[in-house]
Amino acid sequence: MGSTGNPNPWGTTYDSYRDCSQGVCSVYCPQWCYVIFPPPPSFYLDDEDDSSSSDFSPLLIALIGILASAFILVSYYTLISKYCHRRRHNSSSTSAAAINRISSDYTWQGTNNNNNNGATNPNQTIGGGGGDGLDESLIKSITVYKYRKMDGFVESSDCSVCLSEFQENESLRLLPKCNHAFHVPCIDTWLKSHSNCPLCRAFIVTSSAVEIVDLTNQQIVTENNSISTGDDSVVVVNLDLENSRSRNETVNEGSTPKPPEMQDSRDGEERRSASLNSGGGVVSIADILREIEDDEESAGVGTSRWVEEGEGEKTPPPSGSAANQTNGISNFLVRSSMAAMKRSGYDRAKNYRLPK
């Protein structure tokens, strides 16, 4: 070893070890020193390794996966909601268009207003109501059913009019022919303007029932018209007979025998009046007026002719109460005929014939 006073103790000791082939750690051979004494670890490199390992930890990876899954689920739910809403809106529009198409296809149009022959008109509302739907009493007569899911009596589970599902113990109206069920307010509103099923377009009431109802209404109207106009026609005919008799009685005031012409005229008038009263058909007001004019003309001609061809006795024309009675009966006859024509809607162009 060197002395303590030597400032460089390694100089003398390791001077001989300058050859690195001997594997001695010295100043000149530092590589052998690293083998014997390994260097301490670098703190800078360790920090980088720790940071890289912490950046890719399993917790962070799991958190990222959860967030990504949540984002995917929310996006999927949003897309499905939009698609379903759009589809429901399209179905509602399609149903509304179908209902409008059914309404336009089955909207019955009225016949010609000049058709007065009383034929059966299927476009009229059954029961006498206005419009193309059913009568309120007929709608109320349709069966009402309490809905139960387990019965299986109703095939569908929703109403085709409002597109809402049936609830338990809800009142439904079953159509008689097709057995389709609908909500009571929905189908009642539909049947007020339509007479068929919204789904299958089947008519609620058969055509025979429509014909029976229309025939009954036609008979009622005919009977009412006959009752309202029958009295007027009888009054006119009776007045015609009374007028002819009064004229004959006026002529007979002269205490002279009746000429054959007046007798024939009276017989003809009585026969015409009797035929009008006893006829089983109908009586025309135009014919009545025409016969009245013919009677007046024949009575005037017969009277003048009988006066001219008499034996020199000139009977003055009827005057006083007899003339006033004749004129009064004629005026009353004309007024009664005109009133009958007004009440019955008489038209000379159409020449309607009133029932007796």
From Swiss-Prot:
This is RING-H2 finger protein ATL51. The keyword Zinc-finger applies. Gene3D superfamilies: Zinc/RING finger domain, C3HC4 (zinc finger) (3.30.40.10). One of its GO terms (biological process) is protein ubiquitination. Pathway: Protein modification; protein ubiquitination. Its EC number is 2.3.2.27. It is found in: Membrane. Residues 261-273 have a biased composition (Basic and acidic residues). It comes from Arabidopsis thaliana. The chain crosses the membrane at residues 60-80. GO terms for cellular component: membrane. Residues 245-279, 291-329 are annotated as: Disordered.
